[in-house]
Every structure is written in structure tokens, then in C-alpha cells.
Amino acid sequence: MNQSSHNLIGVLLVLILGVLLLACVVGAGLFVWARQEGLNPLKAIQLRINLERHEDELSRPAGSDPQYRKVEILPGDTASIIASNLLAQNLITDAGLFVDYVQYYGLDSQLEAGTYFLQQTQTLEEIAYALTDASAATIPFLTLEGWRIEQIADVIDQNPLLEFSGADFLRVVGPGASIPPDFKARNGIPDVMSNGQPPSLEGFLFPATYKLKPGITAFELRDEMLAAFEQYVTDAMVQQAAAQGLTMYEVVTLASIVEREAVVAEEAPIIASVYLNRLRRPMRLDADPTVQYAIGNTRDGTWWPQITQADYYGLSGVPNQSYSTYLNDGLPPGPIASPGLGAINAVLNPAVTEYFFFRAGCNNDGRHEFFTLEQQAEHAAFTCP
């Protein structure tokens, strides 16, 4: 064998050794890159490569619908079964990718049986981790300031995640429903209202975003909302009302009117001052929302209908006309809606004014024009150009 052949063999050996060394380095690197405890190294590499290829899908929601969907995981359900259920509800777009993700990150053994409430707007990664803790699953439930109890009932009927109806809820909060004695005493809720009817919990179902446990009953929802009222409307506020000669029932009743009138939050204390000034004089409140409450949904199917001046003194045949403060002196028999904390504080801490009248302003921004007794004629003549 000549010298050139020896040199060629040497070069080939070096190349082979280099390739083998490179393969070892690459293999070791892949092992380190994809290593996950409890996974076969080759399987880990395969899963990691697939996840890297679909990185965008992992962080992209399946859709834009914010509606919550109920997902049940039964004891013994595998990752594949769970993935199929998620795919069927359009919560993920790739069942296989979900299985690969939970296997690679060891979540497949942590997926917990239970009831979950998920959205299309969550990513696959977020859903995977959410399904490891059934105790954290809650039903979001929102009520707004200024709603009457029937509107809360309507929202219950629109929520497929709740297992009771709006009618069930009205039975535990409506007129004649049982009211916890301590709550009733604390807030000065009468046994019988001024119109001779039994009271309801109108006004005391605190408006907030609630996180409800799966399987909650109408009775339990009522208790959560009353507990929220007692949390935010403190004993100090009850005492403040008493110092002003008011029960919290009277404060909430007036605050419910202020809530419906005040579009701009900073005007709430001024509007409260108008009504308090009229009560002290005394003058009828002449509050439009009380007329709307009396009419209810009997006119156009909405709970707060448009009214005209003819409605101020023409509610013949309307069952709730005792709520109209154009027809009756003083406060209405009870609250007309759920006031927020701002409206309640406005009644407890009203602005100091000499206003007795107000009208909607002309800028369509929710603000009002206010008038004193001396400006009564100006108030009556006020019109927008």
C-alpha cells in the first residue's frame, strides 16, 4: 500500500470519527433539550419536536366566542378522551396536539375529574393547566348596578351553566320570600311595606362579578349576594344612616333611584341632595325611574320602558302604581333596583345644595342641569335647542 492510500484511509477515519462525535453531541443535545422526567428519551424528543412545530397553535385560542362551556371529566378519563371532548366543543383545534402537550409536560397524570367551565378564548396551554384543578373551577356570574330582580332572573335563564331557573331565583328573593332575620333586622327591612305588601330583597342583591361553585342552588346564590351586600355596606355605614334618621332600607330605596338617574358618577351626590331636599321640605320626589318600575315590562317587554308626561299621573290599572313618586308622597314602598356602592355612599354623603329640580342636559353626555326653588319656572321651561 503506497503512502497516498495510507493518507486517504487516515482522512476517512478522521471524518468517520468526526461524524460519530458530532452525532453523539447532537444526540446528547437533543436528549438534554427534550428531556422530561418519566418519559422515554426518544419519546420525549418526538413530542418536543412536534410541540415546536405547532408552537403557534399552542398559544392561539381556538376561537373568539367568550361564552363559557361546561366540560365534565369523569374518573378514569384518559387524555385522549378529554381531548376528544374538548375538540367536540371547539375549545381546541387539534386533539393530538393536546395529548402530546399534556404527555410531554407530565400533565396527563394530573388531569383531575370534575366540572370545568372553559372558553374558546383560552389557549390550549391554559386549558391543559386549568384541567389539573377541579376545585378552582367556577361559574362567572355578573350583575350590574341598576338592575331589578327580574333582570337578574333573566340573566340566570341565559346562563346554561346554572342548574336552576330565573323563576327559582325569584321564588327565594321576590315578594314574600323568607329573609334571614339578622339581615332583615340589620337593614331595617319591614315586615310589611307601606303599600301593604310583603317586602322582597329588591335592592339588596349586591351588583358584582361572582365566581360560583358548580351545582350552586338559587338559595345559595341569594346568600352569596346578601353576604356581598353586608361586606361592602359596612356596619359603620348602617350607623351613619341611623345618625341621619334613616334605616338602611330607606337609604337603599333612595340609592336605587339615584342609581337609575345618575349616568355620570360624580353627579350622584348632587342628585341625592335633590331628593333629600324634597323629602325634608316635603315635596313629592317626582322621580321618573319609579314610574318605570311601576310599569315594568307590561308595555314594550323591557323592564325600564320609555315614559311620557302622560304616565306621571295616568297609571290607572298598573298594579305597582304605589311605587310612582308622582302619585305618592315620600319614598316608594321599597327599592326599585340594586344600587351600587357609589349610589349608596351618595345618599349617605350627599352634596350640600339648594337644588330641588334637575333635567337631562343638552349635550347627550348623561349630565344634568340643576335648579333651585327660585328657578322652578326656568326648570319647567327648560328645553334643548
Regions found by a protein language model. Give the residues of each.
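Predominantly eukaryotic Lys/Arg-rich, low-complexity intrinsically disordered regions
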Residues: D311, T325-N328, I344-N345
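Small-residue-rich helix-loop
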Residues: A265-Q321
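Short, glycine/charged-rich beta-strand-loop motifs at protein surfaces that mediate ligand recognition
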Residues: N328-P335
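C-terminal catalytic domain of photolyase/cryptochrome flavoproteins
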Residues: L315-N320, I336-P339, V347-L348
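Conserved catalytic or metal-liganding residues and their short signature motifs at active sites
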Residues: M1-M283, P339-G342, A346-E354, C362-P385
